[in-house]
Amino acid sequence: MKRTPHLLAIQSHVVFGHAGNSAAVFPMQRVGVNVWPLNTVQFSNHTQYGQWAGEVLAPAQIPALVEGISNIGELGNCDAVLSGYLGSAEQGRAILAGVARIKAVNPKALYLCDPVMGHAEKGCIVPAEVSEFLLEEAVAKADILCPNQLELDSFCGRRAESLEDCVGMARGLLERGPRIVLVKHLNYPGRADDAFEMLLVTGEESWHLRRPLLAFPRQPVGVGDLTSGLFMARLLLGDSDVQAFEFAAAAVHEVLLETQACASYELQLVRAQDRIAHPRVRFEAQRLLY
């Protein structure tokens, strides 16, 4: 029997709705990965509602929880760590310590960093210290980095001017540590208005993917968390980088189609669960020559 992969997911949790682990855990489980959720914050709802209740996890709890898993002999079974929204830079450093602890017992374990700083339509949504931590410390430790356009621009200290420029900026990030950069949402001058564009860059290749841009009165939150989670899950299940890229794009589109059909502000993960596991649509990534 083929072994089921295990992934430690360290990011936010909301009681109502879908963001952070609340957007990523169930879909990753649905495609066949055992997920260990470690919630950096527990909020009543995501912050784009404008009000919320809850609290941030004390940074010291992160290594304590990782050590607790070690104490029962399971830490070596962790195949990957995924981190997302951080409540503080101190939390981020605790996560890096946890990643190092896991890699010490399983050198093949991967670390995917979703460097949540902001969104083009929402601006910066984390404290300055968190952005500084991501820009200066996390990038060097990540095997896979999954920024959006705003975050890619922040890493490089300037705005991208074209698709080719985005590729060059992603290649610059590869020189700082990661082996894969997945730009979850491209937003550069001259891009198509009716398409949602994504980019995958490795040391050898670059791939561009377009899918239809769906209209919403308010853009659902958690799409990036869902994308990063599904990409990591499919890699653990044996997909190539490009296969995982294409699968994540298709599965996310299926969720958005269901969300749009329900006229919902929250991602409709449960209603779309069968199409997450087996997307009916397929988007083919195009290899770029630069």
Swiss-Prot record:
Quaternary structure and interacting proteins, as annotated: Homodimer.
SUPFAM superfamilies documented for this protein: Ribokinase-like (SSF53613)
Family: Belongs to the pyridoxine kinase family. PdxY subfamily.
Function: Pyridoxal kinase involved in the salvage pathway of pyridoxal 5'-phosphate (PLP). Catalyzes the phosphorylation of pyridoxal to PLP.
UniProt keyword annotations, A-Z: ATP-binding, Kinase, Magnesium, Nucleotide-binding, Transferase
Protein name: Pyridoxal kinase PdxY
EC primary class: transferase
GO CC field: cytosol
Organism of origin: Pseudomonas entomophila (strain L48)
GO molecular function: ATP binding; magnesium ion binding; pyridoxal kinase activity
PANTHER family in UniProt: PYRIDOXAL KINASE
EC number: 2.7.1.35
Cofactor requirement: Mg(2+)
Disulfide bonds: none
Single biological process term from Gene Ontology: pyridoxal 5'-phosphate salvage
Domain of life: Bacteria
Binding-site positions, substrate: 12, 47-48, 225
Positions of ATP binding: 114, 151, 184, 211-214
Catalytic activity from the UniProt record: pyridoxal + ATP = pyridoxal 5'-phosphate + ADP + H(+)
Metabolic or biological pathway: Cofactor metabolism; pyridoxal 5'-phosphate salvage; pyridoxal 5'-phosphate from pyridoxal: step 1/1
